[in-house]
Amino acid sequence: MKNSESIKEFKKLNSSEINEKIDQLRKDLFDLRFKQATRQLNETHQFKIIKKQVAQLLTLSKSQSNSQKSSD
């Protein structure tokens, strides 16, 4: 996984790929929390990066679903 995936790259994904990516990032976030609790985490900046990516994907997913509803 690249740390600097941009919204441009996310826009290329379809809705099922977006949902899969969200699930994967949430699992990564869970793993980071677990590592932090056991004091094994050295890269605390990863929290911010992953949370930002999840927010971008959720926003993109919502806007895609709204555009599909309005076109119907």
Curated annotation (Swiss-Prot):
HAMAP family: Ribosomal_uL29. PANTHER family: 60S RIBOSOMAL PROTEIN L35/50S RIBOSOMAL PROTEIN L29 (PTHR10916), LARGE RIBOSOMAL SUBUNIT PROTEIN UL29C (PTHR10916:SF0). Belongs to the universal ribosomal protein uL29 family. GO terms for cellular component: cytosolic large ribosomal subunit. One of its GO terms (biological process) is translation. SUPFAM superfamilies: Ribosomal protein L29 (L29p). The keyword Nucleotide-binding does not apply. Keywords: Ribonucleoprotein, Ribosomal protein. One of its GO terms (molecular function) is structural constituent of ribosome. This is Large ribosomal subunit protein uL29. It holds the Pfam family Ribosomal_L29. The gene is rpmC. It comes from the Bacteria. It comes from Prochlorococcus marinus (strain MIT 9515).
